[in-house]
Amino acid sequence: MQQFEWIHGAWLGLAIMLEIAANVLLKFSDGFRRKCYGILSLAAVLAAFSALSQAVKGIDLSVAYALWGGFGIAATLAAGWVLFGQRLNPKGWVGVILLLAGMVMIKFA
């Protein structure tokens, strides 16, 4: 396991925020009918992967990717709830809980 440095955690945090932004912008693009939002979404995805590539210099890939994906999904869920009024059914909440539990288990494995 690599030694954790805060700069790599910051890169991972930036990657997560950019992924969330990309997902929200993709929703705003309305299937790329609103091209400006679609292009911004693509740029945010590229920037997210660039930040993730910096994060994995100091964080194990399995841990970084699990945290990036898991927090990205959970935060996108929250953004969808706040911005678009989207709701999960009980099975969806079970999935989110399992996702978060899996992230914790990977981190401590």
UniProtKB/Swiss-Prot annotation:
Keyword Iron: no
Gene3D superfamilies reported in the protein's UniProt record: 1.10.3730.20
Membrane topology field: Multi-pass membrane protein
Protein family membership: Belongs to the drug/metabolite transporter (DMT) superfamily. Small multidrug resistance (SMR) (TC 2.A.7.1) family. MdtI subfamily.
Organism: Salmonella typhimurium (strain LT2 / SGSC1412 / ATCC 700720)
Membrane-spanning residues: 6-26, 36-56, 64-84, 88-108
Pfam families according to UniProt: Multi_Drug_Res
Role, per record: Catalyzes the excretion of spermidine.
Locations listed in the record: Cell inner membrane
The entry's keywords: Cell inner membrane, Cell membrane, Membrane, Transmembrane, Transmembrane helix, Transport
Cell inner membrane among keywords: yes
GO-annotated biological processes: choline transport; glycine betaine transport; spermidine transmembrane transport
GO cellular component assignments: plasma membrane
Protein name: Spermidine export protein MdtI
Quaternary assembly: Forms a complex with MdtJ.
Matching InterPro entries: Small_drug/metabolite_transptr, Small_multidrug_res, Spermidine_export_MdtI
Single GO molecular function: amino-acid betaine transmembrane transporter activity
